[in-house]
Amino acid sequence: NDNDMSIAENHGGMYRNLKLLRDTEGKAECNLFKAMGLDYVFVKDGNDIPSLIEAFEGVKDSKKPVVVHIVTQKGKGYAPAEKDKETWHWHMPFDPETGKSLYNPEGEDYGTVTCNYLLEKMQADKSVCAITSATPTVFGFTPDVRKKAGKQFMDVGIAEEHAMALASGIAKNGGKPFYGVYSSFIQRAYDQLSQDVCINKSPVTIAVFAASVYGMSDVTHLGIYDIPMISNIPELVYLAPVTKEEYLAMLDWSLEQNEHPVAIRVPASLVSDGKP
């Protein structure tokens, strides 16, 4: 399913070949999939059901692995989603007539807190950088913020393993990497966290977001397994703040120390000062 998007915009060399294949309707001589020995079928309009049926009928009895390259439009059929593809990758319950959310929490959230903190740190210290694996808005990095951060922001695409290993390398070379990731997705990078980061004692700061039954609401994305999964890895310090003040203090300490990898379990609620 090639809609020319990751969750945010695409990054990486592979996408240049996908664009070439789209532009040539699959006829380009340079074809990543054929180079790997795979059969290849191009579908120009993947939002057209008859075209999909025809393509699948043509390959269902194949005795070889086949890549069906389906070009689609993200958000097809719903104007707000077509206009703002990144925001509408997922959405809280909304009014289909207006596109407005039915749930509008009031107050400061930890994504905004993290964003403001990182921008200030980046301006004061060029060794600070922020890494995401295709979910930059989880820590408040909207397109405008990403432009402000410039080269101090890196989106590796949906590749949590690479994000973790990249952060380790930056830290070992004197940088101060911050990696923001959903709790549900950190499982994808377990090997890199254990071997690349923790065995090497790389002082990486990892912010674990949506670590709660309230963070994500579907079976595949529940953020409830991060504590048993990563808290027992040797050399990793796992912290769980309950207030904004604690969270910011932990970020400060983690980014400035160079002895341990540190993960911070970001509260899934709105910002609290801890008072009743």
Regions found by a protein language model. Name each.
Residues 30-40:
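Gly/Ser/Thr-enriched, mixed-charge loops and adjacent short helices
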Residues 1-32, 200, 234:
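Mobile "lid/hinge" segments at catalytic clefts and subdomain interfaces of large enzymes
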